[in-house]
């Protein structure tokens, strides 16, 4: 840890007040963000942005940055999004993999254990556990999912244990009902 001298701190604060940051490209901001997320002390970067008044325009919605520093840069980003109501990516141009992971984490966060089956099935289809199994397993390890982690693990395991390949052989008119039945069975087994 180190401390800025007063003159340096004042100079940095004046940059934030001058709107100079508005003229930086989203790509440049992403490069700095990627470096910060790769750091073993990523939270210090965000803490400094806030304390030095450098959040506008790129991080104006950041309010929390309690990160598990042992996580990968991708998972640190997801932690930030989860803690800040998925509002950070709106002003940034993120790589596709970060956008997809953000969307997947948003879908997982939206799952409610007490939700009615129809809504839950819609959400489960969007998550696509078969295609996104590895990413789902990474995301649900995050502290944010502590209260529903067991349920999500059961749900994932029960869905993955079903043989959805039978849908390819089913008559088109029966396919949707059969798929829905597989999801309903998985949901019931997970409660």
What are these regions (language model features)?
Residues 1-21:
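Internal alpha/beta core interface subdomains
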Residues 41:
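Non-catalytic nucleic-acid-binding/docking modules located in mid-to-C-terminal regions
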Residues 30:
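Active-site pocket-lining segments that scaffold enzyme catalytic pockets across diverse folds
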